[in-house]
Structures are given as structure tokens and as C-alpha cells.
Amino acid sequence: MLDAFTKVVAQADTRGRFVSDSQIDALKQLVADGTKRLDVVNRITASSSSIVTDAARALFEDQPQLIAPGGNAYTNRRIAACMRDMDIILRYVTYAVFSGDASVLEDRCLNGLRETYSALGVPGGSVAVGIDKMKAAAIALANDPNGVTRGDCSALMSELASYFDKAAAAVG
């Protein structure tokens, strides 16, 4: 896992060069957006249970075969495992937002997930739909302007969306 600062230094060191002006500008923007970043992480964290529960509920309403007898999420134990996995993915998305870098999400959560799900017979497409539902809820929550730092958050929302997209692509 690398935060944005460590990653920039590692890249410059690998090339045997100083950190470039464009990299410094990008890091300045990351610092300038730090409070917004913390607001997003705090909002998602505070609402994580409802984000996961609502996304799972919507997924099972859209795909009732998953919870029907013989379905992949049939039985409370399997539903709980599905929701646990969704919660883990959401947690790692918040880590990525906090650090400004996707490597923690990719390295510690997504690598090998598709293969694991395939081996267990978990329908990756359904998991991807659940992730998309969490994405919609998290972005709506993060975009609410009440009680957060004012300013343009479009780049941060795009970044947040990209982490969910990476997760959905990794399982789908």
C-alpha cells in the first residue's frame, strides 16, 4: 500500500529524478482537498452499515433468484457472507479515498477476488451490481453539501467512483 506522497517519491527515485512540478502540483491539490477527503470518508464510514444493507436489499430485490432456494445467497449464512464482503469492499474504498491512491484497494482487497469468487461459484456479475448500488449511495451521500467543506468536489467524486468501478470490474 502506498499513499500518494510515497508513490510519487518512489516513482521519482526509480527514475533517478527529482519530483516533477506536475507531481508537486498534484500533491498540492491533494492537500488542498484534504478536508473534503476526510468529510467523504467520515460520511461513508458513519453510514457504512446502511449503505451495505440498502445495497444488498436492492440487489436481492432486483435478483430474487439469489436468495431463493438453491440461490447463491440462499440461507442467512450466505447473505451474511455477501454483506460482509460488500462491507470489506466499501471499507477498502474509504482507505483508497483517504490515501488518495487505489493500491490499498487493489493489493489488499481486489487481487485474486475474481478467482476466489469463481472457485466458490459466486456470481461476479451480481457482486458487481451490488458494488454499483453501494457506489450510487456513497456518491449521493458524499455529494450532499450540508455540513461539509464547501468547494468543487467533482474530481474527488470522480476518484471515489473510480474506486468502486475498479472493484466492480475486479469481480464482474
UniProtKB/Swiss-Prot annotation:
Residues holding (2R,3E)-phycocyanobilin 2: 153
An annotated GO BP: photosynthesis
Post-translational modification: Contains two covalently linked bilin chromophores.
Chain positions with N4-methylasparagine modification: 72
Family: Belongs to the phycobiliprotein family.
Keyword terms, alphabetized: Antenna complex, Bile pigment, Chromophore, Electron transport, Membrane, Methylation, Photosynthesis, Phycobilisome, Thylakoid, Transport
Membrane topology type: Peripheral membrane protein
GO cellular component: phycobilisome; plasma membrane-derived thylakoid membrane
Major subcellular location class: membrane
Keyword Transmembrane belongs to the record: no
Protein name: C-phycocyanin-2 beta subunit
PANTHER family noted in UniProt: C-PHYCOCYANIN BETA SUBUNIT (PTHR34011:SF7), PHYCOBILISOME 32.1 KDA LINKER POLYPEPTIDE, PHYCOCYANIN-ASSOCIATED, ROD 2-RELATED (PTHR34011)
Alphabetized InterPro entries for the sequence: Globin-like_sf (IPR009050), Phycobilisome_asu/bsu (IPR012128), Phycobilisome_asu/bsu_sf (IPR038719), Phycocyanin_b (IPR006247)
Residues binding (2R,3E)-phycocyanobilin 1: 82
CDD domains reported for this sequence: PC_PEC_beta
Subcellular location(s) of the protein: Cellular thylakoid membrane
Kinase as UniProt keyword: no
Job description of the protein: Light-harvesting photosynthetic bile pigment-protein from the phycobiliprotein complex (phycobilisome, PBS). Phycocyanin is the major phycobiliprotein in the PBS rod.
Quaternary structure and partners: Heterodimer of an alpha and a beta subunit, which further assembles into trimers and the trimers into hexamers.
Taxonomic source organism: Pseudanabaena tenuis (strain PCC 7409)
